[in-house]
Amino acid sequence: MTLVTQKAPNFIAPAILKNGKIMNNFDLKKYSNGQITVLFFWPMDFTFVCPSEIIEFNKTFEAFEKRNVKIVGVSIDSVFVHQAWQNTFPENGGIGKIKFPMVSDIKHEIQKSYHIEHPELNIALRASFLIDENWIIRHQVVNDLPFGRNIDEMIRMIDALNFHNKYGEVCPVNWKHGQEGMKASQEGVSSYLKKYFS
């Protein structure tokens, strides 16, 4: 089920913050505070593909921060398991210190509200949601468990959202930051296709 164009479900749940402290009533909407937010889910801590994704989000954190974008991650593990995972070095299967909140969905309520629960295993699929300033989901991608997500694609989508908001133009195939957009009109598409596809 796609949630694109719909209001993002809010939640209040325990989380471990970037300073390592545990917050029992982390409020997603309050934390986002009107900023674009990337909300992503992973199946479980101390597994296989998951640490590579979280470490990559952490490595590219500044790229999100300079775009004024918040990152929040969620899994069904407790905050104490999140904490133990952060306290484990990557060479031992851990993730080290993380610069964004890691939420505990121990009751599975959050993954159900976003409709990304695995039908048999009752864990989250690898889902990412781009939530805009008006709390609308503008982009969603869901991968099956064996396949890691593309962090660069999320950054590209943030750039596309910002471009559209600023100029009112749409972003054609393979659009990247710095490239020309397309006016959403018959004249606009004709001009663009003539320039790039003729």
From Swiss-Prot:
EC number(s) given by UniProt? 1.11.1.26
Compartments where found: Cytoplasm
Q: Which UniProt keywords apply?
A: Antioxidant, Cytoplasm, Disulfide bond, Oxidoreductase, Peroxidase, Redox-active center
The main place the protein resides is cytoplasm
As its record notes, the protein acts as a catalyst of: a hydroperoxide + NADH + H(+) = an alcohol + NAD(+) + H2O
Q: Which residues are in the Thioredoxin domain?
A: 2-163
* Name of the top EC class for this enzyme: oxidoreductase
SUPFAM superfamilies referenced in this protein's UniProt entry, alphabetically: Thioredoxin-like
The record ties this protein, via PANTHER family, to: THIOREDOXIN PEROXIDASE (PTHR10681), THIOREDOXIN-DEPENDENT PEROXIDE REDUCTASE, MITOCHONDRIAL (PTHR10681:SF128)
Record has Disulfide bond as a keyword: yes
- State the superkingdom: Bacteria
Classification via Pfam families: 1-cysPrx_C, AhpC-TSA
Miscellaneous information on this protein: The active site is a conserved redox-active cysteine residue, the peroxidatic cysteine (C(P)), which makes the nucleophilic attack on the peroxide substrate. The peroxide oxidizes the C(P)-SH to cysteine sulfenic acid (C(P)-SOH), which then reacts with another cysteine residue, the resolving cysteine (C(R)), to form a disulfide bridge. The disulfide is subsequently reduced by an appropriate electron donor to complete the catalytic cycle. In this typical 2-Cys peroxiredoxin, C(R) is provided by the other dimeric subunit to form an intersubunit disulfide.
Tell me the protein's name.
Alkyl hydroperoxide reductase C
